[in-house]
């Protein structure tokens, strides 16, 4: 068996890549003549005009798609002139309206959205920068460009002005409308050109096309950036990316394609997103290829069934409203910020914590096909943005859109079988991710076994990251996370792990200090969590105090029970020990932030005996079970989940009550055999076993 989770690092140094950059420019200009643009021109223009990148590059592609400096310079002047004369700046809207009135018609670039005014039975356009809300639109124009009705598109339009006394409609009307998008797309051109690039070069081409400079980016980071593009080439692909601020998480969805919509956090409605029952119109998921939610922490649905419908849609690509079952093709992307460090989150909580409470539900997260580790992507600095040639953004967007019609999900079966830990949803997720990566990297379908292996390894990692969080949220139901694949030729099995697999150091190796005890138990909230008791003993007269529980009296009482039992039964543990010569302070640490627990009496007893006798608890041991003041042992609630949590936290030994022995069949054998188990029948027996005294 092997562990296989390293992405390939191409054997090319940064210096070579820098010189290769110019070869890549030459290759691009040779095989994509007229389809490439220098990205530094985009940056220059972007700083002056608040226009999406694909609009700028559409214009640059018309005038500057050449490697002749004179042509580029002349083209750049043309584009600047068009932006100066025809692009409407919101503060100059009144001036442009006046121009339209004086000249009778005028050509402008603006974002146009259309709605039907049923009272007047006309389509009315809203021009966002010009500030006109009711310009008349011919119905044929709307039929030809349906996206005008949902969210709107950037267009080059000719606006007419005609006014006569007593007219009920607006004097403004649209004469011509040309969407700023590629008119047609020849996929054979892409397939033929792709043959002239190797895989690493093609990854660099894709990254340059969205404005990144691959020479300054590590190989693993490149894969994360490419994965951000999968929703553009795969239908109904669900992905989330949480990470620090400033890593460009939403950039691709906002700037790089006219087919994606970025919904900024905040309220959204079922009618807007899925289906408006009043107007019988499908919402955003029917009109856009990608719907991305920015700032997931702020998402709220006005409707109670919003999350429910979203679950339905994410699982099947369809949902029902009223009597209709409606299908959509849009991929769902969830983007958000992580405020703590990843190490802290992995140890004490789960990596989906930034989602709003209404969405923290295993059924919802199980529908994610991938979780991109945003914390592995560096914060964006100027050197990460390219000044070289890349594909024109809307050409790239159209190529990605065409790839949605194809499927490469059977690529795995030619070379590999998936391991037995993957359930049906895992298999679908891994297939979708592999298919998406291959569509981006090998659109011509000419991929080798090694290409598929690399994509498969990455796909398993990003799905396993989802599964690991589900395991923390849902316990044993999601126990099978050891993803693997089997080579069809050699029948060798390779396991794939997640780099940030943390938490296993919560219970450190080595002998603990006397008075330190770890226990796994259910908190009052119902969540299973890990707790550490730390005890201090000073000279005194037998008093005890407890800290770390705040004002929770029932949790303090549970520890009081342990202390009183300790006081009354110490002679059964040790005849020589003197209880009343010391004062005891017990501090409770919640390692999983699950809240206080009332099942802590037994662990408190063990901690107090340990410090008084100056004998540590056995190495990496976890205490399970609790007791009453009369010494009756209570069995463990949800034994399987408790053992899973103990294992994930790094425990090697378990102290288990005899009364829980009947629950052992509920624990998977491969989990139970990971521990050295000591059974106890009463509290004093538990103390002896914990301290390793026979």
Curated annotation (Swiss-Prot):
One GO term under biological process is:
defense response to virus
Question: What did gene disruption experiments reveal?
Answer: Methylation of 5'-GGTAAG-3' in chromosomal DNA, however BREX no longer confers phage resistance.
Keywords, alphabetical:
Antiviral defense, Hydrolase, Protease
The protein's superkingdom reads: Bacteria
* InterPro entries reported in the protein's UniProt record: BrxL, BrxL-like, BrxL_N, Lon_proteolytic, Lon_Prtase, P-loop_NTPase, Ribosomal_Su5_D2-typ_SF, Ribsml_uS5_D2-typ_fold_subgr
Does Magnesium count among this protein's keywords?
Answer: no
Q: Does the keyword section mention Kinase?
A: no
- Induction comment from the UniProt entry of this chain: Transcribed at similar levels in lag and exponential phase, rises in stationary phase.
* GO molecular-function terms, A-Z: ATP binding; ATP-dependent peptidase activity; serine-type endopeptidase activity
Report the coiled-coil segments.
Answer: none
**UniProt-listed PANTHER family:** ATP DEPENDENT LON PROTEASE FAMILY MEMBER (PTHR10046)
Q: Say what the protein does.
A: BREX systems (bacteriophage exclusion) provide immunity against bacteriophage. Part of a type 1 BREX system which protects against dsDNA phage. This system allows phage adsorption but prevents phage DNA replication, without degradation of the phage DNA. Methylation of bacterial DNA by PglX guides self/non-self discrimination.
Q: Which family does it belong to?
A: Belongs to the BrxL family.
Fetch the NCBIfam families from UniProt.
BREX system Lon protease-like protein BrxL (TIGR02688), Lon_rel_chp (TIGR02653)
Q: What is this protein called?
A: Lon-like protease BrxL
